[in-house]
Amino acid sequence: MSLFKILVAAATVATALAAPHEHKKPHPSYGDANAQCGNHQKLSCCNRGDSGGVLDGLLGGNCQPINILALLPIQNQCTNQVACCTGNSNGLINIPCTNVNL
């Protein structure tokens, strides 16, 4: 009976040690952020507006494309909100930029 307990304990420890751990990068690169953008979207830096709301800075008027090397940390190039923008502002209801979660 004690051999069974030892085997169960060893299997439990081995399973816990083999569990994958997620390691987040402290400073995501341009390439990491750009990977969240879809087709025909450009990674952009959006200035914060005065409204303070959910759509603050994401309506496209204050966004500038980021053209930078893929290896550099994105915080070095954009200290405001990073977003994926289509550059298209045609239509009745249109939000040309979406937030990038870093």
Curated annotation (Swiss-Prot):
InterPro entries: Hydrophobin (IPR001338)
Disruption phenotype: Leads to disordered conidial rodlet bundles and sharply reduced conidial hydrophobicity. Shows also reduced, adhesion to insect cuticle, insect pathogenicity via normal cuticle infection, UVB resistance and heat tolerance.
Chief location category: secreted
One Pfam family this sequence matches: Hydrophobin
Compartment(s) where it occurs, according to its Swiss-Prot or TrEMBL record: Secreted; Secreted, Cell wall
Keywords carried by this UniProt record: Cell wall, Disulfide bond, Secreted, Signal, Virulence
N-terminal signal peptide: 1-18
Disulfide bridges in this chain: 37-84, 45-78, 46-63, 85-97
Coiled coil: none
One function term, GO molecular function aspect: structural constituent of cell wall
GO CC annotations on file: extracellular region; fungal-type cell wall
Key word Secreted present: yes
Entry keyword Disulfide bond: yes
Family: Belongs to the fungal hydrophobin family.
Functional description taken from the UniProt entry: Aerial growth, conidiation, and dispersal of filamentous fungi in the environment rely upon a capability of their secreting small amphipathic proteins called hydrophobins (HPBs) with low sequence identity. Class I can self-assemble into an outermost layer of rodlet bundles on aerial cell surfaces, conferring cellular hydrophobicity that supports fungal growth, development and dispersal; whereas Class II form highly ordered films at water-air interfaces through intermolecular interactions but contribute nothing to the rodlet structure.
Protein name: Class I hydrophobin 1
